[in-house]
């Protein structure tokens, strides 16, 4: 193996490890992480088999961020994929498995806004993929903006049963979430275009992010630079009301002049 090939393989390995590390950070510590069937290396060729597993013992009651993890996987992959999370009652614990592609004949939970509870008896399994989750959001009229309403699975393990509750939960601080999204978008735009970040932040749409505490509001400053042609005073209001009358009077004067000129021409003939 050449050095270039070795360095490239190590970079791919590190890329996959970063994804798994992010997933471990958002999963509750009560769910133990296990290795998947195959390691992940190349974002352009994600494996079809299980890439991570989380195991929860009896009497565990935790919330699993299924949508956030699936979107992490979809953003990491550089090809079209439909991430799938499988949830299985093994008889002694609950098992969460992650796939970049839904396996053949893998079950999908029939949940909706009104019906979101699933009970698994021993050895039964269910799951959800990103496309099905998007359909649920569209059908229920849920906010589809990033990080505004994310699906979590509340898992209650009471053997021999596992009770699952698929719920959408919003951020605790919506304004802080909007600020974080604006900063992430600014960093991405700076990385893609290479333009001046301060210049982009100055001219970005004002609705994307509220101003920081103590910092000047850029949108207000931009709007204050645009001054009206005439100040809205009592005199200008009277002038605006008089404009239609003046236009009518001027037109009538033109008509009278034309009639007089035509009469004079006919008279002198």
From Swiss-Prot:
GO terms for cellular component: host cell nuclear inner membrane; membrane. The chain crosses the membrane at residues 248-268. It holds the Pfam family Herpes_U34. Residues 1-247 are perinuclear space. Keywords: Host membrane, Host nucleus, Late protein, Membrane, Phosphoprotein, Transmembrane, Transmembrane helix. InterPro entries: Herpesvirus_viron_egress-type. Phosphorylated. It is found in: Host nucleus inner membrane. Residues 269 are nuclear. It is a single-pass membrane protein. It comes from the Viruses. Belongs to the herpesviridae NEC2 protein family. Plays an essential role in virion nuclear egress, the first step of virion release from infected cell. Within the host nucleus, NEC1 interacts with the newly formed capsid through the vertexes and directs it to the inner nuclear membrane by associating with NEC2. Induces the budding of the capsid at the inner nuclear membrane as well as its envelopment into the perinuclear space. Forms a heterohexameric complex with NEC1. This is Nuclear egress protein 2. It comes from Varicella-zoster virus (strain Dumas).
């Amino acid at each position: 193996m050449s050095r270039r090939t070795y360095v490239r393989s190590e970079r791919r390995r590190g890329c996959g490890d970063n994804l798994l590390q992010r997933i471990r950070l958002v999963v509750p510590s009560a769910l133990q992480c296990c290795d998947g069937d195959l390691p992940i290396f190349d974002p352009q060729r994600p494996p079809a088999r299980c890439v991570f597993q989380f195991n929860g013992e009896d009497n565990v009651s935790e919330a699993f961020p299924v949508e956030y993890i699936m979107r992490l996987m979809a953003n990491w992959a550089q090809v079209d994929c439909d991430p799938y999370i499988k949830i299985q009652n093994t008889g002694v614990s609950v098992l969460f498995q992650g796939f970049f592609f839904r396996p053949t004949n893998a079950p999908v939970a029939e949940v909706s806004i009104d019906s979101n509870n699933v009970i698994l008896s021993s050895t039964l399994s269910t799951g959800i993929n990103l496309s099905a989750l998007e359909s649920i959001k569209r059908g229920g009229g849920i906010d589809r903006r990033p990080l505004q309403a994310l699906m979590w699975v509340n898992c209650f393990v009471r053997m021999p049963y596992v009770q699952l509750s698929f719920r959408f939960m919003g951020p605790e601080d919506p304004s802080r979430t909007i600020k974080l999204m604006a900063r992430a978008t600014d960093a991405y735009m700076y990385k893609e275009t290479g333009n001046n970040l301060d210049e982009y932040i100055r001219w970005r749409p004002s609705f994307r992010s509220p101003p920081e505490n103590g910092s000047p509001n850029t949108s207000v400053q931009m709007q204050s630079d645009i001054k009206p042609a005439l100040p809205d005073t009592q005199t200008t209001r009277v002038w605006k009301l008089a404009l239609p009358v003046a236009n009518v009077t001027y037109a009538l004067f033109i008509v009278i002049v034309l009639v007089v000129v035509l009469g004079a021409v006919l008279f002198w003939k």
